[in-house]
């Protein structure tokens, strides 16, 4: 079995693959203070709850945008799975030309998403990932990574609004009954949901105008289904795109 780990600034997503089949997946908080023992015990508990045997893990692959956690995660893998993990980074065989001024600047998660999306759809693409930051990654019809855009994430915007506007409460990120809110909570939700939908559709329209081929727009991340349900540009949602990309990259670099 393959253990795939996607470490984001806010959440860490884990998946267990048997061949090309995702057997189980979890989302946990990314913690800078957990020790490798605490991470190891947490994973063993998750495996036990799913009826999975840690001893059956033959490989581990990790994409992380939190460099300080690299040593902790490596030690966790070695001590609790007896496996040295493969980290996504410069020098890895991606099968995708990275046409960025400095390819080393491209986050591991963005490369992983791009590889997974092109492997599945084989066409010009925009991958929108709703994480701590909302990222747009553009892939050409030839399978080249062209670049993209980075925006503040939905959670960051919600936190900033609640922190900076003392009379505005923190609200659940949910689609309101109408874009015209009839109370404070609904008004904030309307601004967040339709504001982000407008941003996504606007940026994707600008990207399409610059490309020779109209791109398919794919969304991933925990909030992708909600935004996709309102967006005019998003045509596909794959919440496990990053995990699938990790599986593909592991296969290409074994």
Swiss-Prot record:
Binding site for K(+): 129
The protein's name: Type III pantothenate kinase
GO biological process, alphabetically ordered: coenzyme A biosynthetic process
Known role: Catalyzes the phosphorylation of pantothenate (Pan), the first step in CoA biosynthesis.
Gene behind this protein: coaX
Pathway(s) per entry: Cofactor biosynthesis; coenzyme A biosynthesis; CoA from (R)-pantothenate: step 1/5
Stated family: Belongs to the type III pantothenate kinase family.
Native organism: Anaeromyxobacter dehalogenans (strain 2CP-C)
Enzyme class: transferase
Subunit and interaction comment: Homodimer.
GO cellular component term, pick one: cytoplasm
Major subcellular location class: cytoplasm
One Gene Ontology MF term: metal ion binding
Keywords: ATP-binding, Coenzyme A biosynthesis, Cytoplasm, Kinase, Metal-binding, Nucleotide-binding, Potassium, Transferase
